[in-house]
Amino acid sequence: MRKLWITLPILFFGYVGQVEANNDVHCLAENIYHEARGESTAGKMAVALVTLNRVKDKRFPDTICGVVKQTKFYPSGRIDLHSCQFSWYCDGKSDKPRDKKCWDDALLIAE
């Protein structure tokens, strides 16, 4: 756990203004949870960093939720399952976290 507190300020330096709304914190936590639930703290933080870096990149949406939920739709309105930036968002499974400890860890990193 000590490593988490040492690494977080370094990881999120320069991103303080990016995680402003509870909605963005929730979206980031969801992404960390679903992409890296079984990973180490470093792996979870890497997912957070990828997400935040995309927010800063002009090729991606400019919000955390926009990046996490970025996808393309067919003209019929159906999601193109191969276009999601993060696979968990388009896999058709429930996105509700089922592992409380992993969710709490993801939320801590996202905050």
Ranges and model annotations:
Residues 15, 19-111:
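Bacterial extracytoplasmic/cell-wall-associated proteins, especially those involved in peptidoglycan
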Residues 4-13:
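Sec-dependent N-terminal signal peptides
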